[in-house]
Amino acid sequence: MTANYDVLIVGAGISGIGAAYHLHRQCPGTSFLVLEAQADFGGTWRTHRYPGIRSDSDLHTFGYRFKPWTGPPIASAAQIRSYIGEVIEANQLGPHIRYGHRICSARWSSQENLWTIEAIRADSGATVCVTANFLWM
């Protein structure tokens, strides 16, 4: 069975969650899904775990305009992940995110004006098929 969405967002890092927020708030009625390969949100701030990892840009400009950063200008990965998590929680974005879904193909059909995306589920190895009018990467 294929699930159909207006927009498919690739990744639940800071950019993907920002995209999800804007779709949720500014485009009511638009169906969207975020596919994340990892077991949780955070992108780089989840996967890079070396000692002392932190932003190299200040979070006052790197953060979301809709949720101004209130912490220290240069933040740790844990602080950034917490910030992203607050956005997910406060805006009920969780139901739109599927963790453990690694995209293995994305094909555009000019005839149908539609993306067909296939992802592999980490928990079962099953292939999931999603179609979308717009692919946000």
Q: Where in this protein do the model-derived segments appear?
A:
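Active-site acidic short loop of glycosyltransferases
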Residues: 2-5, 131-133
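N-terminal Rossmann-like FAD-binding beta1-loop-alpha1 element of flavoenzymes
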Residues: 3-34
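Flexible, glycine-rich phosphate/dinucleotide-binding loops
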Residues: 16, 41, 106
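Short, solvent-exposed loop/edge-beta patches enriched in aromatic
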Residues: 25-29, 38, 91-93
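Carboxylate/His-rich catalytic cores and anion/metal-binding grooves
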Residues: 34-43, 131-137
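Glycine-rich active-site loop/strand segments that organize a redox cofactor
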Residues: 37-86
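Feature captures the FAD/FMN-dependent oxidoreductase FAD-binding
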Residues: 71-137
